[in-house]
């Protein structure tokens, strides 16, 4: 374990960050399956790059201009996903031989894609046949699903496969229990899962094809404009000077970057390679440093407006505009990051940590100079929120804006590095910027296509899970079981649903995670009488926090790998830091006004915001054991109780919580005054 440095050592752009840069790829390969891709070089790399870029362009064109029916568009899309998937993801992370595509991968790629293309080209026939599909169609469906399962194992992981596998087995059991022959049971299940919009080509993959892929491509373009470095520099300038500044930098930068990246593990590694070494050098323990980055990166998935692309799925499932989903997510996200921010501040005060010297921080002048980098994101938010364009067209316009911003950035970078300014230098800079921009555009399209593979496969598997639940009526069984267990104690029902969400969400990507929660857990809460929007936000939050909840806390383990800390301790610390995510969903389940539902007055919203922020502050202080000075266990417990009381809806509970928290602060002020007078 790394030795904790002197807490009074000034923090600079840490040398540790350079020392661990070589380990980043290794950590990504270990904890993020999206990074376990084949190695291509030379001509093969060019061919693959062109294919992936062309696939991304095809996705954009199909989304914007195709009017074909879903049974044609979606199987065709999945056919290309299978081709791209086996080209990029080897059978094992140990198969890293450059330019090597084994015969069995070629076979799987061709057969699997062929199954989906067959469906696409014969869609009208399959629709007319309906449940009268022939044995050859059953074989094609079985092979297509098996190939999809193998691709899922490679690029998504085992947890979602285990859930899907158990549900498919249960679906067979359910069919056979009606004295159906094995073939008839297989035929019924394959028809439902492969040939209808209740399975592989169901709502999840439809939303993925229509919206999510474009936003993934937009995110890839945005990242290559240098916006991640801008976010980190902005966070550094804003909070780096304060006590424990690097941890606050991690919170802000990870929230902004994670919102765009859509991967808690990937964001933990990329921003963590910079922030975690700085936190350690400031004086934070390695377990705490890794936990801060993991908790903040996971929070990026609930950060509006993009919310790791899950907002688009939520809008589809709930049946409200995307812009309203983003607005409803604002207050819970503020509470989440406020809780983390307060925790790292109090930890820094408790340890007496310093920040970064102001003369080593980025200059406001330089940040203002580069603020044009966020214009594509601003354009996207404006187009979507104003309703001026559809979400697909908004993403397309934002991609074009990102290309223009990237071109400007390349040009300005070349001009700034030029020794002399002249017309000739300007012409060269323009030519170089055009070349750089073209290369960056191809790289962005390739990266976007790669990112789309994992999300599309996960959404397809989520469609299978939803289809199995529909075929078997399992949702009703699960709902009735939890309702009976909970009885009239609705809080027990929330606890049981929370446990289900965390278990089902372990190791599952954000988009597929929400699809599973919306199909299995949200109906439970709706049946118990909770509002539709609150139910979906509740299950979404607890599905996401599985990434930092031991034992399968992938984001926390990725953070611990960079921090060189104990993984389990890092996971526990991350859970403590993200305590708001475990409390707030219960609050908006009982008080939907926190999601701006059924709000009757501005005063009501103001009261909710102020008391919720004070409540999160008190809970975080109780967990950290510090407000103005260290607290003993009795005061810590009292602070948590006061915070929870503030979070409970109602004026009386708010007043009780205020009295408790004010009493603790007054007591600490008196203790500090007494100590000063004694000195």
Predicted feature locations:
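Core transmembrane alpha-helical segments of multi-pass membrane transporters/permeases
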Residues: 150, 154-155, 163-180, 186, ...
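Hydrophobic mid-bilayer segments of alpha-helices in multi-pass membrane transport proteins
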Residues: 49-53, 72-87, 104-113, 138-147, ...
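Transmembrane alpha-helix interface/packing and boundary motifs in multi-pass membrane proteins
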Residues: 219-223, 254-263, 295-301, 462-466, ...
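Membrane-water interface regions at transmembrane-helix termini and the short interhelical loops
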Residues: 62-67, 88-99, 125-126, 144-158, ...
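Hydrophobic transmembrane alpha-helices that form the pore/transport pathway of multi-pass ion
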Residues: 232-300, 306-313, 319, 510-542, ...
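Long, contiguous bundles of hydrophobic transmembrane helices that form the permeation core
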Residues: 2, 6-46, 327-451, 554-644, ...
């Amino acid at each position: 374990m790394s030795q904790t440095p002197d807490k009074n050592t000034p923090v600079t752009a840490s040398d540790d960050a350079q020392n661990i840069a070589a380990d980043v790829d290794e950590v990504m390969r270990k904890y993020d399956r999206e990074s376990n891709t084949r190695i291509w070089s030379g001509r093969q790399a060019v061919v693959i790059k062109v294919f992936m870029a062309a696939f991304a362009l095809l996705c954009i064109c199909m989304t914007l201009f195709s009017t074909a029916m879903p049974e044609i568009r979606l199987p065709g899309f999945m056919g290309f996903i299978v081709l791209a998937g086996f080209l990029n993801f080897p059978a094992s992370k140990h198969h890293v031989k450059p330019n090597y595509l084994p015969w069995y991968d070629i076979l799987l790629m061709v057969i699997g894609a062929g199954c989906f293309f067959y469906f696409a080209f014969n869609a009208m026939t399959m629709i007319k046949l309906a449940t009268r599909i022939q044995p050859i169609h059953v074989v094609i469906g079985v092979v297509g699903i098996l190939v999809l399962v193998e691709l899922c194992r490679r690029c998504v992981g085992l947890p979602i496969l285990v859930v899907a596998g158990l549900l498919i087995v249960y679906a067979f059991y359910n069919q056979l229990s009606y004295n159906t022959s094995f073939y008839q049971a297989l035929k019924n299940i394959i028809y439902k899962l492969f040939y209808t919009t209740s399975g592989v080509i169901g709502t999840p993959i439809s939303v993925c094809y229509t919206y999510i892929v474009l936003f993934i491509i937009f995110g890839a373009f945005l990242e290559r404009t240098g916006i991640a470095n801008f976010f980190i520099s902005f966070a550094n300038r804003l909070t780096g000077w304060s006590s424990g500044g690097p941890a606050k930098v991690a919170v802000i930068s990870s929230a902004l970057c994670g919102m765009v990246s859509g991967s808690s593990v990937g964001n933990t590694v990329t921003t963590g390679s910079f922030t975690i070494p700085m936190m350690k050098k400031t004086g934070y323990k390695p377990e705490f440093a890794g936990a801060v980055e993991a908790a903040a990166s996971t929070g990026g998935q609930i950060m509006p407006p993009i919310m790791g692309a899950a907002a688009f799925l939520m809008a589809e499932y709930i049946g409200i505009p995307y812009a309203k989903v983003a607005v409803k997510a604002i207050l819970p996200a503020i509470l989440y990051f406020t809780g983390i921010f307060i925790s790292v501040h109090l930890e820094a005060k408790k340890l007496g940590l310093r920040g970064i010297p102001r003369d080593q921080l980025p200059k406001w002048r330089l940040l203002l100079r580069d603020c044009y980098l966020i214009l594509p994101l601003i354009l996207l938010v404006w187009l979507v929120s104003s309703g001026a364009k559809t979400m697909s067209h908004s993403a397309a316009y934002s991609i074009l804006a990102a290309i223009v911003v990237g071109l400007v950035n390349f040009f300005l970078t070349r001009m700034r590095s030029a020794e002399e300014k002249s017309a000739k230098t300007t012409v060269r800079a323009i030519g170089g910027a055009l070349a750089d921009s073209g290369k960056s555009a191809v790289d962005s399209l390739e990266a976007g296509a790669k990112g789309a593979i994992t999300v599309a496969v996960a959404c397809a598997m989520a469609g299978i899970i939803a289809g199995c639940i529909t075929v078997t009526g399992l949702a009703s069984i699960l709902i009735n079981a939890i309702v009976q267990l909970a009885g009239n104690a609705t809080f027990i029902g929330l606890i049981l649903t929370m446990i289900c969400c965390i278990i089902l969400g372990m190791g599952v990507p954000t988009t597929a995670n929400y699809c599973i929660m919306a199909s299995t857990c949200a109906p439970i809460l709706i049946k118990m009488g909770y509002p539709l929007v609150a139910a979906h936000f509740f299950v979404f939050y607890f599905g996401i926090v599985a990434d930092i909840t031991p034992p399968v806390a992938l984001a926390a383990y990725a953070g611990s790998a960079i921090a060189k800390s104990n993984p389990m301790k890092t996971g526990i610390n991350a859970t403590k830091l993200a305590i708001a995510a475990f409390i707030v969903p219960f609050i908006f389940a009982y008080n939907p006004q926190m999601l701006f539902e059924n709000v009757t007055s501005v005063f009501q919203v103001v009261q909710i915001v102020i008391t919720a922020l004070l409540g999160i502050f008190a809970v975080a202080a109780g967990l950290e054991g510090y407000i103005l000075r260290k607290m003993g266990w009795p005061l810590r417990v009292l602070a948590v109780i006061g915070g929870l009381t503030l979070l409970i809806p109602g004026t009386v509970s708010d007043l009780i919580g205020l009295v408790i928290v004010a009493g603790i602060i007054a007591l600490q002020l008196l203790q500090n005054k007494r100590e000063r007078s004694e000195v």
